Design a protein with these regions (language model features):
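Terminal substrate-recognition subdomain of acyl/acetyltransferases
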Residues: 66, 72-131
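A sequence-composition feature that detects small, non-aromatic residues
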Residues: 13, 21-23, 55, 59, ...
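A conserved beta-strand-loop-helix scaffold within acyl/acetyltransferase catalytic domains
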Residues: 1-44, 106, 123-131
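Acyl-donor binding region in acyl/amide transferases
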Residues: 29-95
Length: 131
């Protein structure tokens, strides 16, 4: 009987009482999923504060086990995230284009899996290598 509002975390940045940026997160059973971010200003590191640091802080406070920061971004590794596969679903209403996208995604997936393996062999910069 949960309501959607109980499953959403919206992190907002204000400047002079005006909303200038926000990050949208969804709260799962044991995972906080970061999904969308937007800003109308260019403030250094604001993206990291809203999308990563505030999300991690919320997850710790709420005892949420994982923060899934979404697809792409080598910069996430420097912030303690490990490389993982993520999935999405798209509908393309053009059979020729659908085939082209399918072929590209198959090739891309092989390369991404190689990159994930290489990155994870290096380990998280915050892991305790002695354990």
């Amino acid at each position: 009987n949960q309501k959607m509002k109980d499953k959403v975390l919206l992190v907002i940045a204000k400047q002079h009482d005006k909303i200038v940026a926000a990050a949208l997160n969804f709260i799962g059973n044991d995972t906080l999923y970061g999904r969308n971010w937007g800003s109308i200003v260019d403030i250094p590191f604001l993206h990291f504060e809203l999308c990563y640091y505030q999300a991690i802080e919320f997850a710790i406070e709420q005892k949420i086990k994982k923060v899934e920061a979404g697809a792409q971004g080598d910069h996430k590794i420097q912030r303690g995230y490990i490389a993982t596969s993520t999935y999405s679903c798209h509908y393309i209403n053009n059979p020729s284009f659908t085939d082209a996208v399918k072929n590209f995604v198959k090739m891309e997936a092989k390369e991404i899996n190689k990159q994930i393996e290489i990155i994870n062999q290096l380990g998280s910069p915050y892991s305790n290598q002695n354990n």
